[in-house]
Amino acid sequence: MQINMLGPLVAHHNGTSVTPIARKPRQVFSLLALQAGTVVPVPALMDELWGTQPPASALTTLQTYILQVRRGITVALGASHNGPAKDVLRTCYGGYLLDVDPTNTDVYAFERLAEEGKRACERGELDLASARFRQALDLWRGDALVDVHAGMRIGMEVARLEESRLGVLEARMETDLRLGRHAGLLPELSALTARHPMHENLWAQFMIALHRSGRTSQALEAFIKLRKTLVNELGVEPSARLQHLQHAILRADPGIDRNGPEVPAAASVALA
C-alpha cells in the first residue's frame, strides 16, 4: 500500500484507492497513516475525533469507523472477507495499528531525502545536496493533508511537516546561493518573502540574491520593508544578523559577494 499525505490524502494498493471518502473514517485513517507501523492508542484516536468532549457512544462509533476503513482495504486487496484487511489494520492491545511499511509513505521519502541533502551539505557536496532538497520538496502536492479535517493530533503533525518543509526550502536556497545560482532564485524568494513577511532567514537570502544580482538598491529596500513589518506587527527591530547584513551591503563588503559561509546558515538551523 502506498500512502501520500504531502498534499491531498491519496492511498492506493495496486492501483485501487484505499482512501476513505467519509470525513471521520478519513480522519482515523490519516492519523493511523501518520504513525504507520505504530500502535495508536484508542484515547488518541478519540482525542483526534472529538477533543475533550467525546460522546457516550465514542468507542462504538470509533469501532464503526475502523470497520469502514477495513472495508475499503478489503476492496483494494480484492478479498471477499475481512481477514486480510484485519491484518493490515490490526486491533492491538489498547489501540489500532496500520501495518504498512513506513517507507511506502511520501512523508518517509521526504524526510529521507531531506536528511540525505543535509549530509551531502555537511560533506561539501553542494550539487548533490541541492538535488536532494529539490527532490524532497517535489514530493509536496500542496499543504499536508489539505483535504482531511484535522483535530488536535493531526493538526500538530501537519504543523510539524509544514515547518520541516519550510526548513528544507531554506536549506535549498542557501545551498543554491553557495553554488552561485542567486539570479535564478529571485522569483521564488520574492514569492516566499511575500508569503512569509516576517521570516528573517528568507529575507536575508532574498537580500543576498538581489545584491549578488546587481540589484543592491532593491536589497536595501527589502531590509526596509522587513523592518517596517517587524516594527508594525511585533514592535521589534530586525535581528543583529540582519542588521549586520544590511551594513555589509551598504559598505560594499566584498565578503557578501562570495559564495560561502557569509550566506545565513539556514541548513544548520532548519535541519539540526
Swiss-Prot record:
A GO MF term: DNA binding
Transcription regulation listed as a keyword: yes
Location of the DNA-binding region in this protein: 1-100
Gene Ontology BP terms: antibiotic biosynthetic process; phosphorelay signal transduction system; regulation of DNA-templated transcription
InterPro entries membership: AfsR-DnrI-RedD_regulator, BTAD, OmpR/PhoB-type_DNA-bd, Sig_transdc_resp-reg_C-effctor, TPR-like_helical_dom_sf, WH-like_DNA-bd_sf
Keyword entries, A-Z: Antibiotic biosynthesis, DNA-binding, Transcription, Transcription regulation, Two-component regulatory system
SUPFAM superfamilies, A to Z: C-terminal effector domain of the bipartite response regulators (SSF46894), TPR-like (SSF48452)
Pfam family membership, one: BTAD
Function field: May form, with DnrJ a two-component regulatory system for daunorubicin biosynthesis genes.
Family per record: Belongs to the AfsR/DnrI/RedD regulatory family.
Protein name: Regulatory protein DnrI
